[in-house]
Amino acid sequence: MPHTAIRHLRTGAIIAMTTALPLAVQASETRLEIVNPRTLHDPTPNGYSTATIVPAGARVAYISGQGGQDHTGSLSPDFAAQVKQAYANLGAALDGIGARPDQVAKLTIYVVDHDMSKLGVLTDNVKAMFGDRLPAQTLVPVPKLAVDPMLFEVEAIVVLD
């Protein structure tokens, strides 16, 4: 009888270890891989990465464009204030889906009447949110956005755990 009990314990331990392994692999597979090939210009000083590799089988969420409106819907006429608020709104949207900034695979930003003078504000805000784990990013200059006082909008593709 003791021999049978040991065999059952050993079988149970093997089953437990086998079922635990895929979970450990899945958890590590949800991490994004940031890629900046040495054969290309280093984009990180400008606040983005060249590419982001999403693990196979990952769940993906798409966050709609977040503008610079505060919680009352008011927009500052100041570009820098709108950018800062838009990233705060993106942070709130990430929180709302249980995600973190390091899970953002790609950003698309829309800038009204873009010129080079705006790059510093854009870079400072993206680095404040993402640190050195900068997602891939595309900047699209536009003549206007959904509401006339809007000067900036950011949307995100997020890989969920």
Kindly label every feature range from the protein language model.
Residues P2-A13:
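Bacterial N-terminal signal peptides that target proteins for export
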